[in-house]
């Protein structure tokens, strides 16, 4: 474990954050214990202040997270102090905070930016590839949770093509545990080409084209077979450990089997559907504790009324999100404004990862969480998502 040299500042940092408005105004130098940047208090502008549950707080001008403290609090504004506060406040130390297994959609995303030498209304254009790396909802969530300090275990059956091996290499580079990742001839790899374009009037638009290695225009995915592969996977997994979370985003039978078995062992199950239109979707919901979806994919939430033991989250883009906890009513949380929107792809994945991270930071088992616990978690998740959209690519500033 990391030596706690500056433990005497832990409570003081919390007080300084709580009294953020007064503390920062009286300070000469400020620091952010999230991104560990140091800057003069004069760099904090009126646009950096935002309301929170206790009044007004300042968003770091470097990373847009509300983890700013000033030297008027009595805390030395030094990088080593900020780094220790980060580990203490965000629960990240030498030991990972939790274990999460993820089954579902893993792609190799190619991100392309289209340039128009004669302007967006002209006919000429050139495409520039700016990134190529693992994507897909499950792929992104695993990488993001690893960045939050989790032990993450992707479960994915990839083929042995160069692209399939690239996905595996990227997962490993992000710090994921690779014991449940395979690259075999009978596996599946899906390629996604995401092109950022402009309409003739200059407004942005995105085109997405799927395919698979070898030139096919169709996705190719391989999931666990429910009759034999899923039971074998659960047996192997639980012989080593029982994960704290199981995340899945595809309602195939194999994933339903894994969710059912792990939930009986105490794992918190998180399902992210792209639609709620089949019996399989509803079965996945019944097997899960947390269900998150967008208003674009799932506008009708009436199905949630049939369940009284879950957290439902519907994201609504810039308008924020709605949530329903157990048998409570649907409630709305406003969005976190961001005028510098570059790319909204992946914002939902940041929301998901931050929700899981926030639940672990809270310290209570999911079944004991109440609305007072959930609201700050969802607000923080929206802040991560809002920050992400200022960056190109689904992983934001991690890319």
Q: Which residues fall in each region the model found?
A:
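Short metal-coordination and nucleic-acid-contact micro-motifs, chiefly zinc-binding Cys/His arrays
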Residues: 25-30, 53-57
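Conserved beta-alpha-beta core of the PfkB/ribokinase-like small-molecule kinase fold
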Residues: 243-307, 311, 320
């Amino acid at each position: 474990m990391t030596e706690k040299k500056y433990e005497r500042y832990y409570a003081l940092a919390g007080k300084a954050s709580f009294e953020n408005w007064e503390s920062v105004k009286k300070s000469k130098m400020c620091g952010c214990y999230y991104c560990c940047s140091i800057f003069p208090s004069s760099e904090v502008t009126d646009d950096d202040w935002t309301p929170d549950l206790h009044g007004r707080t300042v968003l770091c001008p470097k990373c847009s997270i509300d983890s700013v403290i000033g030297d008027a609090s009595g805390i030395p504004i030094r990088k080593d102090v900020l780094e220790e506060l980060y580990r203490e406040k965000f629960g990240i130390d030498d030991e990972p905070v939790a274990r999460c297994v993820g089954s579902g959609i893993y792609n190799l995303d190619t991100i392309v930016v289209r340039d128009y030498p004669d302007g967006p209304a002209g006919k000429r254009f050139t495409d520039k590839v700016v990134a190529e790396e693992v994507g897909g909802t499950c792929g992104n969530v695993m990488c993001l949770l690893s960045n939050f300090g989790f032990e993450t275990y992707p479960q994915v059956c990839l083929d042995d093509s160069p692209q399939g091996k690239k996905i595996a290499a990227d997962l490993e580079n992000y710090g994921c545990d690779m014991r449940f990742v395979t690259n075999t001839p009978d596996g599946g790899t899906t390629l996604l080409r995401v092109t950022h374009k402009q309409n003739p009037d200059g407004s942005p638009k995105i085109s997405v084209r799927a395919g698979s290695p070898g030139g096919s225009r169709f996705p190719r995915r391989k999931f666990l077979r429910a009759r034999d592969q899923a039971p074998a996977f659960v047996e192997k997994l639980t012989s080593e450990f029982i994960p704290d979370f199981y995340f899945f985003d595809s309602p195939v039978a194999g994933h339903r089997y894994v969710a059912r078995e792990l939930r009986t062992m105490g794992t918190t199950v998180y399902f992210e559907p792209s639609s709620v239109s089949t019996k399989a979707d509803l079965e996945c919901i019944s097997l899960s504790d947390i269900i998150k979806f967008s208003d674009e994919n799932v506008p009708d939430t009436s199905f949630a009324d049939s369940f009284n033991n879950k957290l439902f989250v519907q994201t609504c883009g810039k308008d924020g999100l709605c949530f329903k906890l157990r048998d409570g009513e649907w409630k709305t949380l406003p969005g976190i404004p961001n005028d510098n929107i570059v790319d909204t792809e992946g914002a939902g994945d940041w929301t998901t990862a931050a929700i899981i991270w926030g639940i672990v930071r809270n310290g209570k088992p999911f079944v004991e969480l109440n609305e007072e616990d959930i609201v700050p978690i969802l607000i923080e998740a929206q802040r991560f998502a809002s920050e992400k959209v200022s960056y190109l690519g689904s992983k934001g500033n991690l890319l």
